[in-house]
From Swiss-Prot:
The gene is gmk. Residues 4-184 form the Guanylate kinase-like domain. The keyword Disulfide bond does not apply. It comes from Sodalis glossinidius (strain morsitans). Essential for recycling GMP and indirectly, cGMP. It is an enzyme of class 2 (transferase). InterPro entries: GK/Ca_channel_bsu, Guanylate_kin-like_dom, Guanylate_kinase, Guanylate_kinase_CS, P-loop_NTPase. It catalyses: GMP + ATP = GDP + ADP. GO terms for cellular component: cytosol. Its EC number is 2.7.4.8. Pfam families: Guanylate_kin. This is Guanylate kinase.
């Protein structure tokens, strides 16, 4: 079985990262590409399902998993834990399915240290002006909050050079095509192609 690839995708808020991933998943079959499902200790909300939106676990279980080094990365947000299970990711990758993980640069650093074969993608907005427009377009934040989110976005963008690939999301369809092209290129890497075409290669090179 050919191992799937873990893709780490990061971007400042407003760059369109989540929209790109969701659009990609709509065009890729589930047996081919999936999004990572995190563990969390927060309460399940109406309409959510265990194993579909999150793996909902008690605090004691989560903290036991931390002690067992079971997470590729984790963080505490307010009173709740969120984390990416190493075992859950590896089980999906072992079936040949590519997994996409939407995460910030700090989480990306943790994951690359534990899974150096992961591929990382950073998404940039086309300009600060466009990023500001997108943040304001949500019509839900005050000027103070928008200013703080912009400052956080700039801080996030300073880490773009730590990634393998860079996408500028100016035109959404072009950015989506860029994302698909990265996946296609990774699937054409020599190591993966040798496994996929092992029988053919053996016949071609046979005396």
């Amino acid at each position: 079985m050919i191992q799937g690839t873990l893709y780490i995708v990061s971007a400042p808020s407003g760059a369109g990262k989540s929209s790109l991933i969701q659009a990609l998943l709509k065009t890729q079959p589930l047996y081919d590409t999936q999004v990572s499902i995190s563990h969390t200790t927060r309460a399940m909300r109406p309409g959510e399902a265990h194993g579909q939106h999150y793996f909902f676990v008690p605090v004691a279980e989560f903290e036991h998993m931390i002690a067992e080094d079971a997470f590729l990365e984790y963080a505490r947000v307010f009173d709740n834990y969120y984390g990416t299970s190493r075992e859950a990711i590896q089980q999906v990758l072992a079936t040949g399915v590519d997994v996409f993980l939407d995460i910030d640069w700090q989480g990306a650093q943790q994951i690359r240290a534990k899974m150096p074969d992961a591929r990382s993608i950073f998404v940039l907005p086309p300009s600060k002006e466009e990023l500001d427009r997108r943040l304001r377009g949500r019509d839900q934040d005050s000027e103070e909050v928008i200013g703080r989110r912009m400052a956080q976005a700039v801080a996030e963008m300073t880490h773009f050079a730590e990634y393998d690939y860079l996408i500028v999301n100016d035109d959404f369809n072009t950015a989506l095509l860029d994302l698909k092209t990265i996946i296609r290129a990774e699937r054409l890497r020599l190591g993966r192609q040798k496994l996929h075409h092992d029988a053919l290669i053996s016949k071609l090179l046979a005396d």
